[in-house]
Amino acid sequence: MASNTTYGDWMRPIAGGIRNIGRPLTLAGLGVLVVTLMLSMVNVVAAIVTAAVGIGAITVLAIRDREHRNVLDRTVERRTWLAESRKGRALYRSGMLAPVESGQCRLPGILSKVSLVEANDGFGERFTLVRHGHTGEYSLPFACQPQGAGLADDDVEDAYVASWAGLLEALGSEAGVTQLAVTVDTSPDSGVRFRRNLTRRTVADAPELAARAMAQIMDLYASGGASSSVVLTLTFRYVDARTGRFLEPDDAARRIGQLVPGLIRRIADAGGGTARMLTIDEISRMVRVAYDPAAQDTLERDGERPWIAWEDAGPVACETGWDHYRHDSGVSRTWEMCDPPKSNVTSSTLTRLLGPLADCDRKRVTVIFHILPPDRTAFMAEQNRQRAANQVSQERRASIGAMSQVNKANRQAIETNRGAVIVFFGLLVTATVRAGEGEAIRLDAATHAVEGAAGSARIDLRPCYGAQDSAFAASLPLGLNLRNYTPPSVFNQLS
């Protein structure tokens, strides 16, 4: 059963400035006003033209669609993708026939500098770290076995949520933690493991009736099911205080290993079951199947589980489209969350989106959390409160939306004053269908299924246009921190 406890009051950071159009556009408007006043002393016509052009440009840039993008954002997005496509950067080839000497199937794009490192935790157990060469970060993936809330009482379910909030708060106070991501991967079960397990339990001299019953069970229930896996990935970034450089793998593994016992305990308290750290083979196999879905049946059919090296876990070929991503035997589309639900939700809101969908051969939902440290939390809460109040004061008749923002900002400031932390969160959804004849129809059907499930969860999804390859990589449970791949912007520094 689902608890009746509701959750909400999330809000976007308020841009500030005049009418909350943002500080850069506000400064631009003041600049237009100053130039207009100076020109009016010399040439009134030139001043009028300057004011009209300047105010018109600012108005166009201030208008944003439901995806929070203006004309400039959409134009840059499209032109950047076209320029990269003309340069051939939307195509990738690897393996023996690729124009490289290694002959390996390495990962493409922003995953090209990702490697795996083995180390020991506080108890001497071996674990695997994902090293991000581009950003100097390290990620630690845990395989979880969530107990679920289907048979849990309301108080138990509420305790899970409270423990999850405690985990986020503890990570916010931990130096070096930059991101937490939870990935739920659902795929059709081939039935190979089911048949193998039943075959192992069948003896040669079994009674005829029992043998026939087992054979009938294997035929009826081997296919048609779905398998789900849940991976929690923590991303760390450590810098040497003396040299200013990122820590080497041994030093980073030593610091991360000390946190493992406490993390496993907190994950269990939050309903994640007994978490265990993934091995190199499991991570490589997981990535290989994501890029080549047809390989899943082959890997499960082989009795000895062939070893997959990390250097060969990537695709043989992939091609990035404007709204899709073709990789080996699959075609995928990835969405990002534009807005959270407008109203309060319960703990079962994402149930349909996280569960198997009939029109998707594979589906991966990744929820990403960025926890602000306590010192920045108090500053941002107060900043949002002041900007929300300024927005109401600038309106002659305050709208319901503006008043709601004020109420949310006030409650947020009160909670942060009591010790709560601000958490930025996002959501990525990747749907994969098998490549081949009729793939466009199957991809459209998967699109309708995903968007319908997101609609029932009251989440506004948007395809990651022009960045399908990067979004696909970010949805994998490798701890990729997209914030560190975004080029610095002067406008972001001014906002």
Say what each PLM segment does:
Residues 28-38, 54-58:
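Hydrophobic, membrane-inserted alpha-helices
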